[in-house]
């Protein structure tokens, strides 16, 4: 296997951690929104410092990336380190399913037996459904994402093919995102075959979903996001965000690992967050929750704000931005 989390971490933490901030030229964003205002720069500097503090104080390994979908600015730390994905890898499986569904009309409505097994612990939905139950392919995918159910995930891997998921990841430019094993296959995991990705690739995938830049139709892209926005169980990466703000979300957790990936539809300031931890303590929730809270507070301050810091209704601000972009 080409995956060595420990080697990546040792290399990373032999050097000084650097906080990287990029003003990205993202084609989907209006030119008129990219001006870096002095007070915005000061707020971002404080946000960067807060994220760096979470990294410095965390006992294990921490990585994060945040993308402002209004002006394209990114705040990143340790974003190129390859880490265990846990269940966040399931987002790439969902994308590959919809890619194949466009080539196979009716696939999503087809029924499949839903059977748990020893490998997946006979838990989750397997305890609720009878042995001869059948579920539609799309519903299995929703169970995989929204309940993070391992039987559903393994059924989806069988459905679309592990190699096809990886080929599609490469085609999307996700060089480090690799599906190497089924869920709860600890023997493959121990042998170095864990599912893995850099935080940067996680951010790229979520950005592609947010902007509908996927190898699927706009309708399929919208459906992928709708599935990810179905309310999910509590998670420290999602909990700081008010319930009335839609979040396309996927969490992942293993012993030592706690991850949260999301697209937050904050009015007038939508943003993406990728928060990954590894080699973590028994309960990394405080760090994950704190980083997410810091991000939500930062983007909330920018939402609906004029360049002088006062706030106006979101619809008024949207019109002002559109008018400014049109005048360029």
For each predicted feature, which ranges?
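Bacterial N-terminal signal peptides that target proteins for export
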Residues: 7-17
């Amino acid at each position: 296997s080409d995956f060595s989390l420990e080697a990546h971490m040792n290399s990373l933490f032999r050097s000084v951690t650097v906080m990287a901030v990029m003003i990205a030229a993202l084609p989907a964003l209006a030119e008129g929104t990219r001006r870096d205002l002095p007070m915005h720069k000061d707020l971002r500097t404080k946000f960067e410092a807060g994220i760096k503090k979470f990294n410095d104080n965390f006992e294990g390994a921490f990585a994060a990336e945040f993308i402002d979908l209004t002006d394209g600015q990114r705040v990143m730390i340790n974003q190129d380190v390859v880490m265990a994905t846990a269940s966040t890898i399931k987002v790439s499986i969902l994308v590959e399913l919809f890619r194949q569904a466009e080539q196979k009309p009716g696939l999503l409505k087809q029924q499949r037996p839903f059977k748990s097994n020893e490998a997946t612990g006979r838990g989750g939905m397997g305890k609720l459904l009878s042995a001869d139950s059948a579920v539609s392919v799309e519903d299995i995918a929703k169970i995989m994402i929204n309940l993070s159910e391992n039987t559903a995930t393994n059924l989806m891997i069988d459905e679309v093919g592990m190699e096809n998921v990886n080929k599609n990841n490469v085609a999307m430019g996700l060089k480090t995102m690799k599906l190497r094993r089924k869920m709860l296959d600890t023997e493959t995991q121990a042998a170095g075959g864990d599912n893995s990705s850099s935080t940067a690739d996680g951010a790229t995938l979520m950005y592609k979903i947010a902007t509908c830049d996927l190898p699927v139709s706009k309708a399929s892209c919208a459906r992928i996001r709708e599935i990810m926005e179905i309310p999910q169980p509590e998670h420290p990466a999602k909990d700081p965000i008010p319930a009335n703000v839609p979040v396309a979300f996927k969490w992942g957790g293993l012993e030592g690992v706690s991850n949260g990936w999301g697209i937050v539809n904050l009015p007038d300031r939508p943003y993406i967050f990728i928060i990954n931890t590894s080699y973590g303590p028994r309960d990394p929730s405080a760090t994950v929750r704190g980083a997410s809270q810091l991000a939500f507070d930062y983007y909330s301050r920018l939402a609906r704000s004029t360049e002088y810091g006062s706030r106006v209704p979101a619809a008024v601000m949207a019109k002002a931005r559109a008018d400014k972009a049109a005048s360029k």
